[in-house]
Amino acid sequence: MSDTYVDVGYSSSTVGFGRKAGVLVVDWQLAFTDPRFELGGLERLHRARDNTAELLKTARAASLPVAACYTAYCSTKDMPLWKVAAVRREFFYGHDCTAMDPKIHDPSDFTYCKNAPSMFFQTPLITWIVREGIDTVFVTGCTTSGCVRATVVDAFSYGLRVQVVADCCGDAEQG
């Protein structure tokens, strides 16, 4: 964090960890990790995906609950106004790009489809979090500036303790 933020009191206190943690996995689907797809050839996303796979091994071994989402639509009629052409062309139910990356996916995870940037927006996620008794979330996924950011903001807004796992988040742009 830059000195400017520190000087005005950012990070002057911490939220710490609560009683029970869970891991949120945002959009680690083949569209972003498989070079066959327009958005899938970025090395920094592959590194973050591989780091996420390692984190998930540890989390699952510790019996932490994991929720994972992917993005897909029935048609352009139920799709937000994405400016990303590849999303408008490929992100439809049944398209290979919407499948979860096999390095990430585990059948024991709570996996569902979302249709907006946040994992929370009009999805069953908060119900699952309450049922699991989760009060702290570790957020992983892509893209950091879009869907990860939206998920983090909503998690914070729901009163959860939010930990962004930087090495497990990726974006088209560095920084």
Q: What function would you assign to each model-found segment?
A:
Residues 1-106:
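Active-site acidic carboxylates
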Residues 61-64, 133, 159:
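Glycine-centered short loops/turns at secondary-structure junctions
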Residues 66, 111, 162-164:
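Hydrophobic beta-strand scaffold residues
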Residues 94-142:
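Internal catalytic-core helix/loop-beta-alpha segment
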Residues 138-141, 156, 161-174:
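A short glycine-rich beta-strand->turn/loop micro-motif centered on a GG-aromatic cluster
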Residues 148-158:
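Short Gly/Thr/Asp-enriched flexible loops that form oxyanion-binding sites at enzyme active sites
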